[in-house]
């Protein structure tokens, strides 16, 4: 009888132990990723390296930075429009030397895989842009957001110094979240040059440029940002935020995407406020009453902007001094 009781107890204990193991497994599988489960049991790094930054150091040199050291024996990368002469690994960074220079305002694709020192590999495909050493000082100077066929949504940039605009990128939004953009062509400009970009379909005047998608700007609420090049880590040159100050959703911005974009500009110091009330009031703007920068002031705030009088928009020329009352 004692042997039978002991056998039953053993079976119950084994069954109970199995339930505990199964329960723990379910909890782990529901709450942890495969990588975290692997790390939990093996106590080793099983996460692939992550590309955190891309920088073009010169016409033929590209620097890739990862979140952990890379094994130099396992770097397998190619450039589709070029060829890679050599690659050099130093801790978390991989420096690539290309055989031919990257043309200004054009992208080349680098793809392939790298491996960390634990043997975890990752594959990626990225676009890299030439480094423009001669970018002029540029400001967003005038824009409209309630365009029509005759007067489409437009943005005017003004150069306040001489330089080459190749690769400079104007976003409807930010580099993290944009709905349209234009990558400017390889072109030298003088101080005082005005560049006009159409962001919606309609009359295209001689000399005007067109955005990629022609989707228009946010009529009542939105933002523009100007970056040195299209790469994610690019430095911003200028930004502007507008709103009607009456939208009730997403803290007055109308969408979470815009709210996040404005907060990003605020955090980077390119706009003085992350509140909708800190934006330029768009209520009285129209297709011909444009937003105008006041005397090229650049304080990253709504205070440097005004709305011009009806039919007083002056794209391609100095801003009108006639203001909407």
Where are these regions (language model features)?
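Bacterial Sec-dependent N-terminal signal peptides
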Residues: 1-10, 14-59, 121
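A structural motif detector for short, solvent-exposed N-terminal "entry" segments of globular domains
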Residues: 31-45, 55, 121-176, 216-218, ...
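A short glycine/threonine-centered beta-strand motif
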Residues: 58-71, 152-162, 227
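Short, surface-exposed alpha-helix to beta-strand junction/turn motifs within ectodomains of secreted
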Residues: 62-86, 168-170
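Surface-exposed, short loops/turns at beta-strand junctions within beta-sandwich domains
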Residues: 99-107
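Short, solvent-exposed loop/turn segments at the edges of extracellular beta-sandwich modules
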Residues: 114-120
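Intrinsically disordered, low-complexity Pro/Gly/Ser/Thr-rich segments with frequent PxxP/GP/PP motifs
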Residues: 179-207
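Conserved beta-structured recognition patch
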Residues: 216-325
């Amino acid at each position: 009888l004692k042997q039978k009781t002991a056998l039953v107890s053993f079976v119950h204990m084994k069954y109970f132990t199995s339930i505990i193991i199964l329960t723990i497994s379910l909890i782990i599988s529901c709450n942890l990723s495969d990588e975290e489960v692997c790390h939990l049991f093996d106590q080793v790094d099983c996460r692939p390296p992550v590309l955190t930054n891309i920088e073009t150091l010169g016409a033929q040199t590209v620097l890739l930075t990862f979140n952990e050291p890379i094994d130099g024996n396992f770097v397998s990368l190619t450039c589709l429009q070029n060829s890679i002469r050599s690659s050099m690994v130093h801790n978390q960074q991989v420096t690539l030397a290309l055989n031919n220079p990257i043309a200004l305002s054009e992208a080349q694709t680098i793809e392939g895989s790298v491996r960390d020192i634990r043997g975890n590999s990752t594959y990626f495909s990225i676009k890299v842009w030439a480094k423009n050493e001669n970018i002029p000082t540029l400001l967003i100077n005038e824009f409209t957001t309630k365009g029509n066929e005759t007067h489409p949504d437009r943005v005017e940039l003004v150069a306040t110094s001489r330089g080459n605009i190749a690769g400079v990128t104007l976003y409807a939004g930010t580099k993290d979240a944009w709905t349209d953009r234009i990558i400017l062509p390889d072109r030298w400009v003088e101080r005082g040059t005005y560049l006009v970009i159409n962001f919606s379909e309609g009359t295209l005047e001689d000399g005007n440029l067109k955005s990629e998608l022609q989707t228009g700007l946010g009529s009542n609420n939105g933002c523009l940002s100007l970056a040195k090049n299209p790469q994610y880590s690019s430095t911003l040159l200028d930004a502007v935020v507008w709103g009607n100050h009456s939208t009730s959703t997403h803290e007055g911005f109308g969408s979470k995407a815009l709210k996040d974009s404005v907060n990003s500009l605020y955090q980077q110091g390119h706009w003085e406020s992350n509140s909708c009330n800190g934006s330029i009031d768009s209520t009285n703007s129209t297709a011909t009453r444009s937003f105008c920068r006041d005397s090229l002031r650049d304080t990253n705030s709504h205070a440097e902007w005004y709305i011009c009088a009806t039919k007083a928009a002056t794209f391609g020329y100095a801003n009108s001094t006639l203001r909407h009352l």
